[in-house]
């Protein structure tokens, strides 16, 4: 759990926060850039929020302390019974976890810096990790690869700044042992200026010349700083992966022993398999929860989304097309209005299960009628994979009336509404 908090969640949140600050600034300044990066930003911010939320839950529930107390019970059980003595080694396991945390933290910073963060790094990695080689098979000097023009998917100024900022950030957060060799080039030829390095490589490297033949066995390619950078990144990827895999294999053995000891110690209690990504039926009730002494409520309304849309100048995720302002600000939502509250209800809370793979699952009432679609969990449930608190964990579902309202008024899909017999 400490590894999850400190080596996975914290680095992911930190790097994505840095990256998203740059993205937001460029997206606000240019509508065309906003459209290009809207989905990319949403994908990035999704797990950025998830990481922050999970760490908040881990800390607020004292989860590490609770698990440490539970570990003491297993140790005492082993001391008393001798079960798996000589096999389950807590001291050895602790040492391996500490060592893996070091590598896992560096690996997360590495992944969040170099993998799918900008077009230059992506092309550099693609060149070294599999591209279609063209040209005659028997003539190596005439063999080449070509990058297709995909400039409609990225913005040069944004990607350059993101990469420069991430390179600097990476150096500030990992040991020098985990710096790819091209950092020496940054220091020796660019006086440590990551932005100058990125600008030069982007402008000069054959990697960024879409449609140009890169003859893979000629000197120009071998002298290309972008291609050299890609090789350095690939080599560091292996340097991180090999010890991680060795530690994973050794830890897996100890964790099997630990699981066996837990099951033996609690043999009179039921044990359930992991429900993540399995077919299952979950049941529960609609309702909110206690939020620090204040009832959370169990639904959101059109008014709440209007208030968010008004803040789109400061929070880009709240941006919406003018038609959405019109639809959400309507004086009367007609048949889609809730009879009890008199509101158009958007989302609602239940105490159903919302583990991995549940997004989009249908939610039925006691009559078998579709009332919504599950899609997320509240922040207080984000650590539920490792600690489930039934008082706090809630599933968020989108109200099917809201879905139908948009199908009708925005999508003008009245034919589909009639076809499915919605009422």
Map each language-model feature to its residues.
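Terminal presequence/propeptide segments associated with secretion/organelle targeting
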Residues: 1-423
């Amino acid at each position: 759990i400490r590894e999850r908090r400190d080596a996975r969640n914290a680095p992911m949140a930190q790097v994505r926060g840095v990256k998203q600050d740059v993205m937001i600034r460029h997206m606000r300044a240019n509508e065309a850039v906003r459209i290009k990066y809207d989905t990319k930003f949403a994908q990035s911010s999704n797990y950025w929020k998830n990481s922050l939320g999970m760490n908040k839950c881990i800390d607020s529930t004292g989860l590490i302390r609770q698990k440490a107390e539970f570990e003491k019970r297993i140790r005492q059980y082993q001391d008393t019974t001798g079960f798996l003595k000589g096999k389950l080694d807590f001291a050895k396991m602790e040492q391996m976890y500490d060592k893996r945390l070091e590598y896992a933290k560096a690996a997360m910073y590495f992944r969040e810096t170099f993998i799918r963060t900008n077009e230059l790094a992506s092309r550099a990695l693609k060149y070294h990790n599999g591209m279609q080689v063209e040209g005659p098979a028997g003539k190596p000097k005439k063999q080449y690869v070509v990058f297709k023009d995909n400039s409609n998917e990225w913005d040069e100024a944004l990607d350059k700044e993101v990469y420069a900022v991430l390179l600097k950030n990476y150096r500030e957060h990992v040991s020098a042992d985990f710096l790819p060799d091209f950092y020496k080039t940054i220091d020796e030829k660019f006086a440590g200026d990551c932005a100058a390095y990125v600008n030069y490589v982007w402008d000069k490297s054959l990697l960024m010349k879409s449609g140009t033949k890169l003859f893979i066995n000629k000197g120009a390619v071998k002298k290309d700083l972008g291609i050299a950078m890609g090789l350095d990144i690939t080599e560091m990827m292996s340097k991180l992966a090999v010890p991680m895999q060795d530690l994973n294999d050794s830890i897996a053995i100890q964790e099997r022993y630990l699981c066996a000891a837990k099951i033996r110690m609690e043999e009179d209690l039921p044990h359930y398999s992991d429900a993540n990504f399995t077919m299952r039926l979950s049941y529960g009730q609609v309702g909110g929860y206690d939020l620090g002494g204040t009832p959370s409520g169990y639904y959101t309304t059109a008014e709440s989304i209007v208030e968010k849309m008004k803040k789109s100048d400061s929070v880009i995720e709240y941006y919406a097309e003018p038609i959405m302002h019109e639809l959400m600000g309507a004086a009367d939502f007609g048949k889609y209005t809730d009879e009890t509250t008199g509101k158009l209800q958007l989302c609602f809370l239940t105490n159903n299960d919302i583990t991995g793979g549940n997004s989009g699952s249908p939610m039925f009432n006691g009559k078998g009628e579709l009332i919504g679609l599950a899609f997320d969990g509240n922040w207080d449930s984000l650590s539920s994979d490792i600690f489930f608190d039934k008082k706090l964990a809630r599933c968020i579902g989108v109200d099917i009336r809201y879905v139908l309202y948009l199908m009708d008024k925005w999508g003008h899909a009245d034919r589909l509404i009639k076809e499915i017999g919605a009422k």
